[in-house]
Amino acid sequence: MSHRKFSAPRHGSLGFLPRKRSSRHRGKVKSFPKDDSSKPVHLTAFLGYKAGMTHIVREVDRPGSKVNKKEVVEAVTIVETPPMVIVGIVGYVETPRGLRTFKTIFAEHISDECKRRFYKNWHKSKKKAFTKYCKKWQDEDGKKQLERDFSSMKKYCQVIRVIAHTQMRLLPLRQKKAHLMEIQVNGGTVAEKLDWARERLEQQVPVNQVFGQDEMIDVIGVTKGKGYKGVTSRWHTKKLPRKTHRGLRKVACIGAWHPARVAFSVARAGQKGYHHRTEINKKIYKIGQGYLIKDGKLIKNNASTDYDLSDKSINPLGGFVHYGEVTNDFVMLKGCVVGTKKRVLTLRKSLLVQTKRRALEKIDLKFIDTTSKFGHGRFQTVEEKKAFMGPLKKDRIAKEEGA
């Protein structure tokens, strides 16, 4: 009986079983950072949309290292993060079996893009969501009931979370249904958290009020789907020798005669990608401001630095491929993140206390690349391209027709 001569570690991790399609499209926060009442009241998570990647040049600030004070080129991901709108407050009580919801209070006015989340087919529906609930805020009995609810939450709740949704109308996506999630409020006492959340009902919360420059965060999302794949692609098992009968990209032995079934740990073909994953320790290189109007002019230069003073936006020439233009606030993260373009990502504050030097390093960007990401881009701005290419034939024809 033939057998392999040497043992080897198994291919692929069993820690992520079952490898099947995620049941949810938006990344779920399974645990929030530990609360610290000595800190000011703040949110612990935010939603963003993956736009694409580019690269930056920066000077390393790591005394004692060989690369200290030297320039490095690093890949970065741009995540568009328009302000989120707070539309509800949820109070939780601690029980022997974990957290249980105590009371949920929604705002008086809720936008249609948020209401769409409560319907499967908005077009055919009667669009009656929250019509009865909003009357609570208008009559005297309802107002008294809401006050009683707020006071009971202050008395009994240990954890306060807000319900916030994204603003799809600000994004270059076709989707109209907003993404909705609960975000835990940390810092201060329960009464301070509740007052903070109540003040911000129906208000927008920008990303720079949640995260800061050079902060380490976690990214939660669903990976890019690959469909049904064979065992070699899915588990990275070794290909069999060339002369193998009935295929090479297979597992030769899937188990013993008895027990007369295939063990769960044996690599098999099946779904690859579209899995729910959490990546920790992604460093924020820049929190950029969206387009704004100042003195009647549209200000776009959110990609210029102290070393590169050219007037350019974060968008590469032609926009981000398969996404479009980033016109809102954005977060620049080091390296890559899960998911395809347009994928909704959950950004969460780190659960760990960061002490490593790389985590605490100050980032000073020298240059942000804005060349076209479709082909081999050469030009940083449209003006630079025009100066190099000279007058074009189409411009001359348009000028002649105008004359």
From Swiss-Prot:
InterPro entries: L3_arc_euk, Ribosomal_L3_dom_3_arc_sf, Ribosomal_uL3, Ribosomal_uL3_CS, Transl_B-barrel_sf. Keywords: Acetylation, Cytoplasm, Isopeptide bond, Methylation, Nucleus, Phosphoprotein, Ribonucleoprotein, Ribosomal protein, Ubl conjugation. It is found in: Nucleus, Nucleolus; Cytoplasm. Pfam families: Ribosomal_L3 (PF00297). There is a cross-link at residue 294 (Glycyl lysine isopeptide (Lys-Gly) (interchain with G-Cter in SUMO1)). One of its GO terms (molecular function) is RNA binding. Residues 18-31 have a biased composition (Basic residues). Belongs to the universal ribosomal protein uL3 family. PANTHER family: 60S RIBOSOMAL PROTEIN L3-RELATED, LARGE RIBOSOMAL SUBUNIT PROTEIN UL3. This is Large ribosomal subunit protein uL3. It comes from Sus scrofa (Pig). The gene is RPL3.
